[in-house]
């Protein structure tokens, strides 16, 4: 089957993308690494020795950045529905985050040690129909917030990809109830046409 004009356009944009070229040059698995690096440069959310949970981790761009910045004394637990090539000293749980059994496996892997930071770059498979995509995206955000509320230490931080639309304002209010400070970030490496933003919540108040 011949490729559509849309897929031709996507491929051209992808390979012309300066962040894709930078990722190939710098050894990162995806352009998403630069989104986290930009946020890190501004907000310094990652430090040596931290315990971090990375949701929606595949192919591993955020895990690569995180692992490097938390160092040998740090601990990183990552999860995705898709497989991810191993990264040294990273514990990876493959499975559907919306599945209770996978959620339980992730909690088991985290164990009793309080987590300093939960990061999530999760997004559902987009159909292009906003009325269908937005509720699925917000459901993943709700689950990520639930996990963060269970595992974060008091004072811990939460960074999550979120899409403007139905449910956004309610979610923002919910996050503000549990954290001291909430800010929105739109990295330069996030494509202009994308509705994605990153919500950064700092200073978890405790369960």
UniProtKB/Swiss-Prot annotation:
Its EC number is 2.1.1.166. Keywords: Cytoplasm, Methyltransferase, rRNA processing, S-adenosyl-L-methionine, Transferase. It catalyses: uridine(2552) in 23S rRNA + S-adenosyl-L-methionine = 2'-O-methyluridine(2552) in 23S rRNA + S-adenosyl-L-homocysteine + H(+). It is found in: Cytoplasm. InterPro entries: RNA_methyltr_RlmE, RNA_MeTrfase_FtsJ_dom, rRNA-MeTfrase_E, SAM-dependent_MTases_sf. NCBIfam families: PRK11188.1. Belongs to the class I-like SAM-binding methyltransferase superfamily. RNA methyltransferase RlmE family. This is Ribosomal RNA large subunit methyltransferase E. It comes from Azotobacter vinelandii (strain DJ / ATCC BAA-1303).
